[in-house]
Amino acid sequence: MQKAVIIYSTTDGQTKRICEFLKQKLEDKINIDLFSIEDIDRAELNFYDKIVIGASIRYGKHSPKLYKFIEKNIDVLKAKFTAFFTVNVVARKEGKNTPDTNPYMKKFLQLTNWQPNLLGVFA
């Protein structure tokens, strides 16, 4: 059975709750673990076939820890099947609720050298 990991960067806990929900929905289909972005290291990432990262917005920005994590692990992320989602209140607005139209997603993709296989936005 394939192994996946969900990694979250959260400020107030909403992103963690979303990730816990995703894990619960997927765990009967795939071996899946859940970690805070601070609690997983590069060596552990290599054990997973699929990597999902969820991150919240605080004062208009993703956490610097998110960008450092991606920069540090970019070669692993590029070699795996990956997904990324962002959690922000702007995503509740029509015209800003898709990965292609959400300003925070667009900015994130411009600032990183990572192009995940799947993208999502949640409000």
Annotate each predicted stretch with a short phrase.
Residues 41-47:
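Short amphipathic alpha-helix with an adjacent loop that forms part of the alpha/beta core around
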Residues 2-4, 17, 25, 29-35, ...:
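FMN-binding flavodoxin-like domain, especially the glycine-rich phosphate-binding loop
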Residues 13, 41, 91-93:
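Flexible, glycine-rich phosphate/dinucleotide-binding loops
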Residues 6-8:
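Conserved N-terminal substructure of TIR/SEFIR domains
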Residues 10-17:
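Glycine-rich NAD(P) Rossmann-fold beta1-alpha1 loop
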Residues 10, 38, 88:
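Residues in the short beta-alpha loop(s) of Rossmann-like NAD(P)-binding domains
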